[in-house]
C-alpha cells in the first residue's frame, strides 16, 4: 500500500477516516511483529504507515475545526 495522497484523504467521510486509521494501526502492529522476528523486508513501510495515520488525523481535525 503506497502512501496516501492528501486529496484522497480529504475526499473521505469521517467514518472512512476512522476505518483507515484502524486498518493502518493493525498494519503497524503486524509490521512491528515482522520486524521483531526478522521477517520485515520493507522497513520504510513502518514510517509510511505512521505518517499516513498522522496525515489522516490532521485532516480530520482540520475538518472538525472548520465546522465550528
Curated annotation (Swiss-Prot):
User: What's a Pfam family in this record?
Assistant: Ribosomal_L29
One function term, GO molecular function aspect: structural constituent of ribosome
A GO-annotated cellular component: cytosolic large ribosomal subunit
Give the record's GO biological process terms. translation
The text of the family note is: Belongs to the universal ribosomal protein uL29 family.
| PANTHER family the record matches | 60S RIBOSOMAL PROTEIN L35/50S RIBOSOMAL PROTEIN L29, LARGE RIBOSOMAL SUBUNIT PROTEIN UL29C
Q: What is this protein called?
A: Large ribosomal subunit protein uL29
**Organism ancestry:** Bacteria, Pseudomonadati, Pseudomonadota, Alphaproteobacteria, Hyphomicrobiales
